[in-house]
A protein has these predicted regions:
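Conserved ABC transporter NBD signature motif
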Residues: 62-76
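Conserved structural motif at the start of ABC-family nucleotide-binding domains
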Residues: 9-11, 24-26
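ABC nucleotide-binding domain signature
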Residues: 38, 79-87
Length: 139
């Protein structure tokens, strides 16, 4: 996927229940690459469930999913990324080591985020909060 291309992921008519408790009903969400989307709501209203459905780690009772307008009946893990609330990269790793551990080439990170060129040997704990979140998003 080219960093400069725009793509749209849509999920529609999302339904999710646990027993008799309806968690999500008729939810629609569209997200575009290169942007940030916030999902807001009270505790327990289904935000995390929606993200897990979007990323394929939770199966909805029903949902429709389109990528760039093309309907998909199966989840495409290679085309969706999800950044969880808590960080997951150990602070003692360097940026370069994290990339190697995930099997990702250094040049690909630089194509998306050129400012990381000066951070190759930097420990994760020394990165700013924003730099850590960018790296976690990339991984």
């Amino acid at each position: 996927m080219n960093p400069s291309e725009k793509h749209i992921l849509e999920i529609d008519s999302v339904e999710l229940s646990f027993g008799d408790r309806r968690i999500l009903s008729g939810v629609y969400l569209a997200v575009e690459t290169g942007g940030v989307t916030a999902v807001l709501g009270r505790n327990g209203c289904g935000k995390s469930c929606l993200m897990k459905i979007l990323c394929g780690s939770l199966r909805a009772d029903f949902r429709s999913m389109r990528i760039d307008g093309v309907w998909h009946d199966r989840f495409r893990a290679d085309e969706v990324r999800y950044l969880a609330q808590q960080g997951f990269i150990p602070g003692w790793l360097t940026v370069d080591r994290a990339l190697r551990d995930f099997g990702l080439p250094w040049d690909d990170l630089l194509a998306w985020f050129p400012l990381f060129g000066k951070l190759r040997g930097t420990k994760i704990r020394a990165l700013s909060g924003g730099e850590r979140r960018i790296l976690e998003s990339y991984l």
